[in-house]
Amino acid sequence: MFTKQVTDSKAYQWFQERLEIQGIADDISTKYVPPHVNIFYCLGGITLVCFVIQFATGFAMTFYYKPTVAEALSSVQYIMNEVNFGWLIRSIHRWSASMMVLMMILHVFRVYLTGGFKKPRELTWVTGVVLAVITVTFGVTGYSLPWDQVGYWAVKIVSGVPAAIPVVGDQLVTLMRGSESVGQATLTRFYSLHTFVLPWSIAVFMLLHFLMIRKQGISGPL
């Protein structure tokens, strides 16, 4: 993987003595890829790229977004109209969010139709399903953050759905909203989920997902 000029350098020798980077590079570059693999096997990787874009653009917007009922919408308008390239950053965030959900759905279908969930890859499939749920939850929580009419009523409807569950339904609604009605506590909880809980959760399950894929390799043809 490394050229002779690189391997002869002092920097390479320094890292090689301490981390054995040649072995790591060989493991990455010589992994067997089955001949039946085609472009549809790249859908998972495209989903990852979309997430990286989401993380970068979302992080950029946290410098200007204000998660309060009174200022959320005005801060989003400020990002769109006043911040340099703010309109582009938020637009890319929205477009890549839609693309991430689409690629995730197509990836799930590809894995299911090609039997990639079968033994010995059951746990890889389980972590993938968890990642799919987290991805959808990202969309639901992010949709509310502008706190406009669309976001407000979306939160009100989504947070009211658990009320139909027997016994614990009302408690779940209160847990999601932070109170009996939709308000500041609801926005704070959705913002915390969207910017802290979900990113850490998806990072952990992505790591598990990729480690299992590296260990087991790509599934064979049907």
UniProtKB/Swiss-Prot annotation:
Heme b 1 binds at residues 107, 209. Its cofactor is heme b; heme c. GO terms for cellular component: plasma membrane-derived thylakoid membrane. Binds 2 heme b groups non-covalently with two histidine residues as axial ligands. The chain crosses the membrane at residues 39-59, 97-117, 123-143, 193-213. Belongs to the cytochrome b family. PetB subfamily. The 4 large subunits of the cytochrome b6-f complex are cytochrome b6, subunit IV (17 kDa polypeptide, PetD), cytochrome f and the Rieske protein, while the 4 small subunits are PetG, PetL, PetM and PetN. The complex functions as a dimer. This is Cytochrome b6. The lineage of its organism: Bacteria, Bacillati, Cyanobacteriota, Cyanophyceae, Oscillatoriophycideae. The gene is petB.
